[in-house]
UniProtKB/Swiss-Prot annotation:
One of the record's GO molecular function terms: sialic acid:proton symporter activity
Localization per Swiss-Prot or TrEMBL: Cell inner membrane
Alphabetical keyword list: Cell inner membrane, Cell membrane, Membrane, Sugar transport, Transmembrane, Transmembrane helix, Transport
Top-rank taxon, per record: Bacteria
Gene3D superfamilies documented for this protein: MFS general substrate transporter like domains
Lineage: Bacteria, Pseudomonadati, Pseudomonadota, Gammaproteobacteria, Enterobacterales
GO cellular component annotations of the record: plasma membrane
Protein name: Sialic acid transporter NanT
Organism listed in the record: Escherichia coli O45:K1 (strain S88 / ExPEC)
Length: 496
C-alpha cells in the first residue's frame, strides 16, 4: 500500500457493497451459532427427559460434528461451482430445519439424526460465509474480515443463553428449538439482496465450470470406491459416537479407518499438495480438542458442579461468549498487524495463564469467574476467528470453499470427540479439573503446529515440488516454506 493509503482508516477502504456483504454473512453466522449451541444449554433437561447417560447426552453435541465433514465437502463444492451466495442460503435452510426437528424429537435417535442435519448446514455456512467475506474484502484487511465474521457465532451463543434463561423456565426446552426456525426467513432475504464474492466472480466470470472436489471424488474414475468409503466413514462415525460401543479397541480401529478415508479423499482432491491438506486437518483437529470441551460442557459444569440456577448460568455464559466475540475482533486486528500465525501463537500463550484459575476458584464469586472466563475466551477461543483466513490461504480460489469446508470440518471431529473425552475424564475427576487439564495440555500442541507452520514444513519435506511459498489470500510468505540457511528465491513458488 502507498503512504497515502496507509493514512486512511481501515474501515474507509471498504465500500457499501463490501459492508453489506459482511453484514449479511455475519448475521448468518450469528444465527448459526444460536442454533448450534442450543443443545449445550438444555443438555441436562434433554438428558433427564430421555433418560440418557452423561456420555449419551454428550454424543448429541458430537452428532453435529460427525456430519460436518460431508456437509463441508458438498456445500463447499456447491460454493466453488455455483457461487458462495447459494451455498450460504442452502446452509442456513439446512441447520434451521434440523433445529426445528430437534424440538419435535420423541427420543434420542431422532434428535441425533436432527443434529446430523444441523452439522451439515453448519459446515456449509462456515465454509461459504468465510470464503464469501474474505474474498469480498481487500487483501490487507482479510484477517479482520475473518475475525469479525467468526465473532457472529459467539454473539449467537450469547443471544441463545439469554433466550434460554427467559424461555426454558416458562415453556420448557422444546420451545427453544422452535425459535431456531426463524433463520429460514433470513435465508430468503439473503438470496435476493447480497452480491457475489469479488474473487469468485473474477475467477469464474464467463469461464467454464471448475472441477470441484465433488467432481473429483464422486464423478471421477474412483467414484464407486469413494462412495463406498463415504458410507463406511459415516457408519464408522455413527458407531463411534452413537453406537454405545464399550470396547475402546474397536473405537480406535474405526477411528483409524475414518482417518485413512479422509486422507485418501485429501490426496485425490489436492494432488501433490496433499501433505498441506492433511496437516491442516491435524491443526484443526487439535484446535477443536483444546477449545470444545469448555464450549460444550461449560453449561453442564455451571449447573452441576457449581449448582448455578438458569439465570446465573446465562449471565456467566454471557461473559464467556462475549469474550470470545471480542477476541475474534481483536484477533483480526492482531492478524493484520503481526501476521496470522504469529498473532495466533501469542494469543494462545497468553490464554494459558488463565485456564487453570477459571476452574480453580469455584463458584463463590460469579463476577470474578465471569471476568476470568471473558479474558480466557477472548485470548483462547476468540483467536480462532482468524482460522478461516489461515486455512484459506493454502488453497486457490477455485477450490477454496470446498478445501476450507472439508479440511476444517474433518478436523472439527475433534469437537465431536472433545465433550465425550471431557465426560469420560470427569468420571474419574471432577468436571472442572477434566476441562482445565484437557484445554491446557492440548493448547500447547496447537501452538507448536501453527507456530512452526507445520503444513508448509511437511509439504517441503514430502512434496517440495508443489510447495506454496506465499499465502494465496494476502500474499504474505509462509515461514515453514523457507528451510534454514536457504534463500526464499531458491524455492518453487506455486501459482496463486
Amino acid at each position: 500500500m502507498s503512504t497515502t493509503t496507509q493514512n486512511i482508516p481501515w474501515y474507509r477502504h471498504l465500500n457499501r457493497a463490501q459492508w453489506r456483504a459482511f453484514s449479511a454473512a455475519w448475521l448468518g453466522y450469528l444465527l448459526d451459532g444460536f442454533d448450534f449451541v442450543l443443545i449445550a444449554l438444555v443438555l441436562t433437561e434433554v438428558q433427564g427427559e430421555f433418560g440418557l447417560t452423561t456420555v449419551q447426552a454428550a454424543s448429541l453435541i458430537s452428532a453435529a460434528f460427525i456430519s460436518r465433514w460431508f456437509g463441508g465437502l458438498m456445500l463447499g463444492a456447491m460454493g466453488d461451482r455455483y457461487g458462495r451466495r447459494l451455498a450460504m442460503v442452502t446452509s442456513i435452510v439446512l441447520f434451521s430445519a434440523g433445529t426445528l426437528a430437534c424440538g419435535f424429537a420423541p427420543g434420542y435417535i431422532t434428535m441425533f439424526i436432527a443434529r446430523l442435519v444441523i452439522g451439515m448446514g453448519m459446515a456449509g455456512e462456515y465454509g461459504s460465509s468465510a470464503t464469501y467475506v474474505i474474498e469480498s474484502w481487500p487483501k490487507h484487511l482479510r484477517n479482520k474480515a475473518s475475525g469479525f465474521l467468526i465473532s457472529g457465532f459467539s454473539v449467537g451463543a450469547v443471544v441463545a443463553a439469554q433466550v434460554y434463561s427467559l424461555v426454558v423456565p416458562v415453556w420448557g426446552w422444546r420451545a427453544l428449538f422452535f425459535i431456531g426456525i426463524l433463520p429460514i426467513i433470513f435465508a430468503l432475504w439473503l438470496r435476493k439482496n447480497i452480491p457475489e464474492a469479488e474473487d469468485w466472480k473474477e475467477k469464474h466470470g464467463g469461464k467454464a465450470p471448475v472441477r470441484t472436489m465433488v467432481d473429483i471424488l464422486y464423478r471421477g474414475e474412483h467414484r464407486i470406491a469413494n462412495i463406498v468409503m463415504t458410507l463406511a466413514a459415516a457408519t464408522a462415525l455413527w458407531f463411534c459416537f452413537a453406537g454405545n460401543l464399550q470396547n475402546a479397541a474397536i473405537v480406535a480401529v474405526l477411528g483409524l479407518l475414518c482417518a485413512a478415508i479422509f486422507i485418501s479423499f485429501m490426496v485425490q482432491s489436492t494432488g501433490k499438495r496433499w501433505p498441506t491438506g492433511v496437516m491442516l486437518m491435524v491443526v484443526v483437529l487439535f484446535a477443536f480438542l483444546y477449545s470444545w470441551p469448555i464450549q460444550a460442557l461449560l453449561p453442564t459444569y455451571l449447573k452441576t458442579d457449581l449448582a448455578y440456577d438458569p439465570h446465573t448460568v446465562a449471565n456467566v455464559l454471557f461473559f464467556s461468549g462475549f469474550g470470545a466475540a471480542v477476541g475474534c475482533c481483536v484477533g483480526g486486528f492482531l492478524g493484520d498487524w503481526l501476521g496470522t500465525r504469529k498473532a495466533y501463537v501469542c494469543s494462545l500463550l497468553a490464554s494459558q495463564l488463565l485456564i487453570i484459575p477459571v476452574f480453580a476458584i469455584g463458584g463463590a464469586n460469579v463476577w470474578v469467574l465471569g471476568l476470568l472466563l471473558f479474558f480466557q475466551q477472548m485470548l483462547g477461543q476468540g483467536i480462532a476467528g482468524i482460522l478461516p483466513k489461515l486455512i484459506g490461504g493454502y488453497f486457490d480460489t477455485d477450490q477454496r470453499a470446498a478445501g476450507l469446508g472439508f479440511t476444517y470440518n474433518v478436523g472439527a471431529l475433534g469437537g465431536a470427540l472433545a465433550p465425550i473425552l471431557g465426560a469420560l475424564i470427569a468420571q474419574r475427576l471432577d468436571l472442572g479439573t477434566a476441562l482445565a487439564s484437557l484445554s491446557f495440555s492440548l493448547t500447547f500442541v496447537v501452538i507448536l503446529l501453527i507456530g512452526l507452520d507445520m503444513p508448509s514444513r511437511v509439504q517441503r519435506w514430502l512434496r517440495p515440488e508443489a510447495l506454496r511459498t506465499h499465502d494465496a489470500i494476502d500474499g504474505k510468505p509462509f515461514s515453514g516454506a523457507v528451510p534454514f540457511g536457504s534463500a526464499k528465491n531458491d524455492l518453487v513458488k506455486t501459482k496463486s
